Amino acid sequence: MQVSLVDYRTGYLVDLEGIRQVIGDRLLIVDAIQGFGVVDAPFALADVVVSGGQKWVRAGWGTGFLALSDRAVETLVPVFSGFNATDADGTPTEVLAPARSARAFSVSNPDPVAQARLAAALEEIAGVGIPAINARLAEKVSRIIDLADEFAVEVVSSRAESERAGIVVIAPEPDQLTLLTASLHNHGVTSTTREGTVRLSPHVTTDEETFAMLRGAFTSFASAVNL
């Protein structure tokens, strides 16, 4: 069973405990990129957890990890790997058995600088704690939802804190989509538009100035709609 911890289109946060109960002993593979670093998820229930470090962890591009349970190591067979995906020393020329670890899925030597960036970012997260980060982010997300409600912009992502992480999805009328995205852009607000919806995502460091920019964008949008 393969799932995204947080759906990038809808912002929905899955219930890993519920999924594990339903699928029984089947392998559970989790793409955690949209929630790792801000969601206190029970990752130990998964057999595979994979995530990049460039999003919530803020470690920059070229960072990430793959974690496998013992059962996943025994069950999964790599289709494509590099020369270092074996436990053999040196640079053998013959085809060898893959390593008995997540190393079996590596394709090249690691980047020490990227490793250092990821380690430093994770140390900062560990120092603060995921629950504290999640609580602060929930406040920021709620403020975006409240602003959208104030200006009658429909929120189609979940409002329940147990079903969301850091993505708010709003859905203007189809003929108002371009107007909304233009208003956001003109006020310096970065957003993502997909399939007729607009995604907004704060961070724990999103400040009052940024929320004022978002309010300004919504104000311009609402004024143009009412003309």
Annotate each predicted stretch with a short phrase.
Residues A135-S142, D149-H187:
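Conserved PLP-binding catalytic core of the aspartate aminotransferase-like
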Residues Q176-L227:
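PLP-dependent enzyme catalytic core of the Aspartate aminotransferase-like
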Residues L45-P92:
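Active-site PLP attachment segment
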Residues D87-F105:
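The feature captures the short pre-catalytic strand/loop hairpin that immediately precedes
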Residues A99-I145:
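Structural signature of PLP-dependent enzymes
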Residues L27-I29, V48, I167, T190, ...:
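Structural preference for beta-strand elements that scaffold enzyme active sites
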Residues M1-G37:
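Active-site phosphate-binding strand-loop segment of PLP-dependent enzymes
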